[in-house]
Amino acid sequence: EFAPGDLMLITDHINLIVMGGLSPLRGQNIDSLGPRFPDMMNAYDDVLRDIAVRISNDLDFELRQGVYASLAGPNFETPADLRFLKVIGVDAVGMSTVPEVIVARHAGIRVLGVSGISNKANLDGNTPTSHDEVIEAGRVIVPKLVNMIRGVLYNI
């Protein structure tokens, strides 16, 4: 239901990178930076999300909401990857964001997660994703994202 050029407010994530053993918190913990096992139950701050929704309404664009999955990349997903992600409840997928969220939450930093939808999932494998398509969607996404983030920053 999402389209290239949409912005999606991340309400939760599925961390497939860390499930594969690549946690940004591996190694010895520095207690002064945060707890060994940070709580990820509310990784994305409700207050910041509410502000983002209000700002996007003020700016007259639809801010989608959904669950983000993080994969290691750097490659686009296979049709089987995409079908699996759909079954487990993923709305958008990317190669970043989640490791940064984990580190931020480890440090006690509030997080607002927003994902730019750059291409449509091709579940049947008939239409390959092109890098040019992703770049073009970015041109649509950037002005909306910049204006929304400015609005959020002015309201916190």
Placement of each model-derived feature along the sequence:
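Glycine-rich phosphate- or other oxyanion-binding loops that anchor nucleotides, phosphorylated ligands
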Residues: 1-125, 131-156
